[in-house]
Amino acid sequence: MGQKVHPHGLRVGVIKGWDAKWYANKKDFADNLVEDNQIRKFVKKELFSAGISKIEIERAAKRVKLNIYTAKPGVVIGKGGSGIESLKKKLTNYISGKNILINIVEVKSVEAEAQLMAENIAAQLEKRISFRRAMKQTMQRAMRHGIKGVKTACSGRLGGAEIARTEHYHEGTIPLQTLRADIDYGFAEANTTYGKIGVKVWVYKGEVLPTKKVEKEEANA
């Protein structure tokens, strides 16, 4: 059976960057990695209603900077920045003895962000909305935002069936093997009365061409 590699991991260093931007020696590497994982889990849980699509972590000597990509920056920031101050205090349980900086980045096209799309489908499944309807409506909204293609998959006891299965739907093109293709990927889980249902979303936003090649072509023209 053909297995799918993670679209982001496959393109790291080619057209995509790292979500963890830091360097550590062998002694500290494992601790930093565990700390990163705990931070991401906590922030996603604490700010779930804000629609977090991505969290980037940058580290310096005694400083940790979080770039939080969110659909609702007002929910994260709070009244007069109270939300950020509260988040910083809670993060001291995971980050000790370091200065914490939080940068909020607004996600413009929420309907075409793979992680937010997956979470939206999962939320609808938990409200007992038909999985086919949830998937198709989410895909149609995304296609209106000018993306090249979208694919969704739901796995589990769909509709309360005795036997678990996977159903896929797609619109447009999704070139998963093309490294220059900008593929956004999101995963979420829906906790239903019949058990967990996994939701995966792939969004194709177009090709990313190497800048050097484009510059050469422009010079030759």
UniProtKB/Swiss-Prot annotation:
Residues 39-108 form the KH type-2 domain. It comes from the Bacteria. SUPFAM superfamilies: Prokaryotic type KH domain (KH-domain type II), Ribosomal protein S3 C-terminal domain. GO terms for molecular function: mRNA binding; rRNA binding; structural constituent of ribosome. InterPro entries: KH_dom (IPR004087), KH_dom-like_a/b (IPR015946), KH_dom_type_2 (IPR004044), KH_sf_prok-type (IPR009019), Ribosomal_S3_C_sf (IPR036419), Ribosomal_uS3_bac-typ (IPR005704), Ribosomal_uS3_C (IPR001351), Ribosomal_uS3_CS (IPR018280). Keywords: Ribonucleoprotein, Ribosomal protein, RNA-binding, rRNA-binding. One of its GO terms (biological process) is translation. Belongs to the universal ribosomal protein uS3 family. Part of the 30S ribosomal subunit. Forms a tight complex with proteins S10 and S14. PANTHER family: 30S/40S RIBOSOMAL PROTEIN S3 (PTHR11760), SMALL RIBOSOMAL SUBUNIT PROTEIN US3C (PTHR11760:SF19). This is Small ribosomal subunit protein uS3. It comes from Clostridium botulinum (strain Alaska E43 / Type E3). The gene is rpsC.
